[in-house]
Amino acid sequence: MFICRKAFVALAAILLILTACAPPTPFDSITKTPRPGGTASASATETPAPATSSLRVEKEALRGAQVNIWHPWFGAEASLFQSQVTQFNTENEWGIVVNGQSQGNYSELFLQTDAALEDSSYPQIVVGLPEHALEWQEHVVDLQPYISDPLYGMSADEISDFPAVIWNQDEVDGKRFGVPAQRTARFVLYNQSWARELGFDSPPATSSEFEQQACAAHKALGEDEDSTNDPLGGWLIDTHAMTPLSWMIAFGGGVQEEEGYRFLTPGNIAAFRFVKTLQQKNCAWVASLDLPIPDRLAARQALFATASLEDLPDQARAFSVANNTDEWTVLEFPGDERAALVVYGSSYIMFESDDVTQLASWLFMRWLLSAENQVRWVQSTGLFPLRSSTMQLLGDYSSSHPQWAEAVELLSDGETTPRLASWRVVRVMLEDGFRDMFDTIRHPDLTAGQVPLILKQMDDTAEDLNN
């Protein structure tokens, strides 16, 4: 009835290959020294001593330094990144030359980088996921000395400008494996207008309230004149890996335990039983592929759906195309006593080379993280602003994208994904196992009572993948 452990591992490997998929002013340490001599009325001022770098690279040595960077982006994102590369090459004071190359998606980037590391033909920077950096850790440069450098680093105020959930994702056991490039999250989308018509004045704050509203939506469709929508309403089931992870955390669970994984926990059992029970009550359903999810939410086929931050523009367009003026918003995943939001995304990762090239690479990375550059990324991608100060430059964007602005307000509640190299394959297993739980054709007799067996199988498979 369940997929065997070996099949899980094999499927994870196949999916990884096939799946195609996010300048601060240098801080000068100033020491004022009283002027010797003088009178009591004299102004005791002194020219601040210039900051000096501890990185053992003369400024002149940076001129002409070549930095190659591989990234996963294509289309508009790739064009924007290339324009920023061109701008940096034109304007940077050191004469550094950056060359960008797209690998098409994260899966291909990982494979190409993995191969390049074997024959020492790798770039200086890659835009990869934090778990990728942990997989390559013997080649990855610890960025902490660059961040803390008196001349070329970042001040405490600059670092605190990054929300902790964004900044801390790349640090493991005191080593900084990267700095954030893009961050997103998975949200529950909620049709407020329809909910009010169903008698609910506020969004669900708990899982029980979520169930109550989802079942009310299903009941309403079953009682209208259109018999074709009788199976619909409620939550439109989604099996993106961050969806089950968010549900588990909302119920007090999670997946990482020290340097490994643990799926079979009371919180995870409660989370999986909750969503499976919703399906058994017909208050949650799996959509066919003939109509996109945004169109279904806009057509009131579901009261709740789940989507990532970058999907919000598509959802807004779907409501517009449908001439649907319903109000909708984004929510965290509700549990019994808390809600959950999982923040994830890509990072700039530096590989070992020589002192000059590494400093040149860092200076480009630091430049990309400026608030002004982040504005362009947000406007193009719809993802989170990496810095709090960026929001001050996005007033017009916030006004015209209200659901995005609401999502940003939830960022302080965010949590990170597991900081383990094996997460890149374990998340594929989690996604597949969660999807399989809702497959009533393969498993017509599967009930919420069998959830512990599913989670035990995930434990066993994750142990294999983590070793």
What are these regions (language model features)?
Residues R196-L198, I269, T277-A284, F319-L386, ...:
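Extracytoplasmic/periplasmic substrate-recognition and gating elements
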Residues W328-L331, Q379-D432, D436:
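Long, aromatic- and glycine/proline-rich binding clefts that accommodate carbohydrate-like moieties
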Residues V172-A181, R186, E211-Y261, A302:
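Extracytoplasmic/periplasmic solute-binding protein
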Residues Q213-H218, E258-S288, F333:
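Glycine-centered hinge/linker elements that transmit conformational signals in sensory
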Residues A49-K59, L129-F187, S227, T325-E332:
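Hinge/lid segment of periplasmic solute-binding proteins
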Residues V57, Q144-F162, D226-W235, G252-A271, ...:
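Short, solvent-exposed loop/beta-turn-alpha elements that line the ligand-binding surface or hinge
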Residues G38, R196, S412-N467:
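Conserved C-terminal helix/tail region of periplasmic/extracytoplasmic solute-binding proteins
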Residues Q87, E91-D161, R196-G199, D295-R296, ...:
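Extracytoplasmic "Venus flytrap"/periplasmic binding protein-like
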